């Protein structure tokens, strides 16, 4: 997987003398030397009956034999937008501009659907569908006559699903973000999608708004087509797709309704044809250097705790060794530069107008924190793309010297509760710090009495039960919500305190869980715990009333239970058949539970990571007749 820079080649020159046929003595090659895969389907004189069979059904909606046998590259548009996926629905419009770009550059566009993933409507969790969409897209990219692909990304899980599949197959690929929604407003204040939900829950629990007011407040943030306008998982992953090099520079932050979004869709369509000519593949772009850059960018933008899961999954599928511990190694000491909710004040439109990802990268470059030679989708290095980028609004994007917070990266914790878990330090509020982290003798550590909930249903049923005697220093623990237990790892770790504490002005308690939380949440939870309770991890042994000690400086989280008692609990759990969780409801739930890895390893399907660069290592798929 070379990271050497490739010189961009005009598509019309590179593709000028190709297309005779894909097998035999005269192979279909362009000036760069690679074979266009699609010729094996559409122009194979050595097997004319199969050529005819492959051709004829693509003619029935208006494509011509001349086009399909012209030697022009066939470019897929992996369409993630649909009525079921409102965050990505605008891609149905953008795809027309992508088509025009592909045709302008000398390619032929073929659009196809990707399994829908909508964060806010899929039960039991959209994370269950990331690997399913990945599998389907791998089969399409490998098994159909495609020479390159435009990946339409946006809502949380669509981005990693698409990049994972592109990494596995390893044909030329470029990503196009759908873009964030326009800014939300409620009574003169910015309301960020997702983030406002957690604030509205507090107000509802405190009795300050009724149910109608709750819905009105939440809906105020959903202003237009596009994904969450906060620095949630969607904006995070789209920004990181750019820092990885898989999007055109400056494209991630463009709001969905802006004219620039349609323009970049056209440019993306043009560029993928050139990438096919240059044979510029995901493995050339997504190198270890690109992943190190991405970890640092994630810290600087205040990115979601879902990022380590998804980025590590992408790395595993492209064959790059990346551990959860490296998120602390490379990212912990990076300052917070982007002032977006939930860690800050502003929203997506402001992020774009302030300079987006290039402005952030430029600040990190000045400190020598970016691997500048990492190649990107436009054929240039990230250094070339971002060196002259400027901050256009210093209220939204800060300089490295005057950040919002000096350290914004994740702390990776371990102990007898789990082998690894992640805490997002950029969202630790002053109120939380004063209550949990203000002991001058031990300023980065806290202890608390554990209150255990087995799943969100148990939590919602009992959180306001006075018999639990939850106070301002308790630690809420939720388990059974991981990749196996839920299944899919639910976004439920950011638990609100009991209503009586909210009325006292306590808006957040320390939370620990083997699930995830929305990237739009401002809760400084300890989450992504691996192994999960359903894999008989340490959280399965915990009991309500146990005391937990968390030390951020040492990176530890432990139940203060004797080793002999802990071992006895482990033996008792094994004797009882292990931690119990709900049964399978669908065939896919059973399949995924049997194959899925833990969150620290990217929550990938374990057998799938053995399949890498399959377009080149596995040969052509066999004929179908």
Name every feature range the model reports, one short phrase each.
Residues 91:
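Glycine-rich beta-alpha loop segments
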Residues 2-87, 96-114, 120, 126, ...:
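Catalytic or ion-coupling anion/metal-binding cores of large enzyme and transporter domains
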Residues 111-144:
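N-terminal small/polar loop signature for handling phosphorylated ligands or for N-terminal nucleophile
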Residues 141-162, 173-178:
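A short, small-residue-rich loop immediately preceding and capping a beta-strand
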């Amino acid at each position: 997987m070379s990271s050497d820079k490739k010189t961009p080649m005009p598509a019309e020159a590179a593709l000028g003398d190709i297309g005779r046929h894909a097998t035999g003595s005269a192979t279909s090659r362009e000036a760069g030397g690679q074979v266009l895969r699609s010729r094996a389907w559409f122009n194979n004189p050595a097997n004319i009956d199969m050529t005819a069979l492959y051709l004829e059904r693509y003619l029935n909606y208006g494509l011509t034999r001349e086009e399909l046998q012209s030697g022009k590259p066939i470019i897929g548009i992996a369409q993630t937008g649909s009525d079921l996926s409102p965050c990505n629905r605008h891609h149905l419009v953008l795809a027309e501009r992508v088509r025009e770009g592909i045709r302008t550059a000398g390619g032929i566009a073929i659009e196809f659907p990707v399994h829908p993933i909508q964060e806010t409507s899929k039960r039991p969790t959209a994370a269950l569908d990331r690997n399913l969409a990945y599998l389907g897209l791998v089969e399409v990219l490998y098994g159909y006559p495609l020479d390159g692909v435009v990946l339409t990304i946006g809502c949380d899980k669509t981005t990693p699903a698409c990049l994972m599949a592109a990494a596995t197959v390893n044909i030329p690929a470029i990503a196009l973000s759908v873009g964030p929604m326009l800014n939300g407003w409620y009574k003169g204040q910015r309301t960020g999608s997702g983030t406002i939900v957690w604030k509205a829950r507090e107000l509802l629990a405190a009795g300050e708004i009724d149910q109608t007011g709750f819905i009105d407040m939440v809906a105020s943030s959903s202003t237009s087509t596009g994904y969450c306008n906060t620095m949630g998982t969607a904006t995070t992953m789209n920004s990181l797709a750019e820092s990885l090099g898989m999007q055109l520079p400056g494209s991630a932050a463009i709001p969905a309704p802006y004219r620039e979004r349609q323009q970049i869709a056209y440019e993306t369509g043009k560029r993928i044809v050139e990438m096919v000519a240059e044979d510029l593949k995901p493995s050339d772009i997504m190198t270890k250097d690109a992943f190190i850059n991405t970890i640092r960018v994630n810290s600087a933008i205040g990115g979601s705790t879902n990022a380590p899961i998804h980025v590590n999954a992408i790395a595993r599928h492209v064959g790059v060794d990346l551990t959860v511990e490296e998120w602390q190694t490379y990212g912990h000491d990076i300052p917070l530069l982007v002032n977006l909710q939930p860690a800050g004040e502003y929203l997506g439109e402001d992020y774009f107008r302030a300079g987006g990802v290039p402005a952030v990268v430029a600040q990190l470059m000045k400190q020598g924190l970016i691997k500048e030679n990492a190649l990107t989708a436009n054929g240039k290095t990230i250094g070339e793309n971002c060196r002259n980028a400027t901050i256009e609004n210093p209220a939204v994007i800060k300089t490295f010297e005057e950040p919002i917070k000096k350290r914004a990266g994740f702390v990776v914790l371990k102990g007898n509760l789990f082998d690894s878990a992640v805490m997002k330090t950029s969202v630790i509020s002053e109120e939380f710090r004063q209550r949990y982290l203000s002991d001058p003798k031990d300023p980065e550590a806290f202890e608390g009495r554990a209150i255990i909930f087995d799943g969100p249903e148990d939590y919602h049923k009992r959180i306001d039960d006075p018999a639990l005697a939850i106070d301002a220093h308790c630690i809420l623990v939720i388990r059974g919500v991981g990749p196996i237990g839920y299944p899919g790892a639910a976004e439920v770790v950011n638990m609100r305190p009991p209503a009586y504490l909210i009325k006292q002005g306590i808006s957040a308690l320390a939370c620990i869980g083997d699930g995830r939380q929305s990237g739009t949440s401002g809760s400084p939870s300890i989450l992504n715990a691996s192994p999960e309770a359903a894999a008989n991890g340490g959280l399965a042994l915990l009991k309500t009333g146990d005391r937990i000690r968390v030390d951020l400086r040492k990176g530890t989280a432990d139940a203060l239970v004797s080793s002999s008692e802990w071992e006895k609990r482990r033996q008792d759990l094994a004797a009882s058949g292990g931690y119990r969780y709900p049964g399978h409801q669908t065939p896919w739930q059973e399949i995924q539970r049997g194959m899925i890895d833990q969150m620290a390893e990217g929550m990938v399907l374990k057998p799938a990571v053995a399949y890498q660069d399959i377009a080149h290592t596995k040969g052509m798929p066999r004929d179908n007749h």
